[in-house]
């Protein structure tokens, strides 16, 4: 009997699939976030040369997350990951104030890409545990997110090691996928 209701439930409320592209400058914490979401563990990482791809399931949403390296030489390859992206997750090291202008430039370059025009934007203001971290409100101004008039976006403070804020971001993605 339980199997019957399980089958009915999955038919009436199927998993929503979301192709997610996670980008940001090198050292922002993208890979640490990916594996915190996937394994609920903090893993030791090395700079990503190329990409990592993992499937993360969260409350009836299946996210295929493409984590692409953020080194300057690799950024030219980002465009090959754009097709069919539902959600763009842009990770910013909120404690590295000197690189925030560079992050803003890369973000706005991404947002100008026609293949990403319909994607939702989730900004993870990562490393909130660092003493000099900028708050999400400060990063909203520094990244000029308020100027984005024709795109759904959300920013939340995160700590990839503890998981703080990550599920808040996924809840926003879930809400966007249902609308």
Swiss-Prot record:
Q: Which UniProt keywords apply?
A: ER-Golgi transport, Golgi apparatus, GTP-binding, Hydrolase, Lipoprotein, Membrane, Myristate, Nucleotide-binding, Protein transport, Transport
Q: Which PROSITE patterns match?
A: ARF (PS51417)
Q: Which GO terms describe its molecular function?
A: GTP binding; GTPase activity
Instruction: Provide the GO biological process annotations.
Output: endoplasmic reticulum unfolded protein response; intracellular protein transport; IRE1-mediated unfolded protein response; vesicle-mediated transport
For this protein, the activity regulation entry reads: Alternates between an inactive GDP-bound form and an active GTP-bound form. Activated by a guanine nucleotide-exchange factor (GEF) and inactivated by GTPase-activating protein (GAP).
InterPro entries from the entry?
P-loop_NTPase, Small_GTP-bd, Small_GTPase_ARF, Small_GTPase_ARF/SAR
Residue ranges, annotated region (Important for the stable binding to the membranes): 3-16
Where, subcellularly, is it found? Golgi apparatus membrane
Domain of life according to the entry? Eukaryota
| Enzyme Commission number(s) of this protein | 3.6.5.2
Q: How does it sit in the membrane?
A: Lipid-anchor
What does the record give as the reaction this protein catalyses?
GTP + H2O = GDP + phosphate + H(+)
Give any Gene Ontology cellular component: Golgi membrane
User: Looking at the keywords, is Lipoprotein present?
Assistant: yes
Which coarse location class describes where this protein primarily resides? Golgi
Quote the record's binding site residues for GTP.
Answer: 24-32, 126-129, 160
Covalent lipid attachment of type N-myristoyl glycine occurs at 2
> Record's Pfam families?
Arf
Q: What does this protein do?
A: Small GTPase involved in protein trafficking between different compartments. Modulates vesicle budding and uncoating within the Golgi complex. In its GTP-bound form, triggers the recruitment of coatomer proteins to the Golgi membrane. The hydrolysis of ARF1-bound GTP, which is mediated by ARFGAPs proteins, is required for dissociation of coat proteins from Golgi membranes and vesicles.
- State the similarity comment: Belongs to the small GTPase superfamily. Arf family.
- Protein name, as recorded: ADP-ribosylation factor 1-like 1
Q: What organism is this sequence from?
A: Caenorhabditis elegans
Q: What is the lineage of its organism?
A: Eukaryota, Metazoa, Ecdysozoa, Nematoda, Chromadorea
């Amino acid at each position: 009997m339980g199997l019957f209701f399980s089958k009915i439930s999955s038919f009436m409320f199927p998993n929503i699939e979301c192709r997610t592209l996670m980008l940001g400058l090198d050292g922002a914490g993208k890979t640490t976030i990916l594996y915190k979401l996937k394994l609920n563990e903090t893993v030791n990482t090395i700079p990503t040369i190329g990409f990592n791809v993992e499937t993360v399931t969260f409350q009836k949403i299946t996210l295929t997350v493409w984590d692409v390296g953020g080194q300057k030489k690799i950024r030219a390859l980002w465009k090959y990951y754009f097709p069919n992206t539902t959600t763009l997750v842009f990770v910013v090291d909120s404690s590295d104030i000197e690189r925030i202008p560079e992050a803003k430039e890369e973000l706005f370059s991404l947002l100008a890409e026609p293949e990403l025009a319909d994607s939702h934007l989730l900004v993870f203001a990562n490393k909130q545990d660092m003493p000099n971290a900028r708050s999400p409100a400060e990063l909203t101004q520094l990244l000029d997110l308020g100027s984005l008039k024709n795109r759904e976006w959300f920013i939340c403070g995160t700590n990839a090691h503890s998981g703080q804020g990550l599920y808040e971001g996924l809840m926003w993605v879930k809400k966007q996928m249902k609308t």
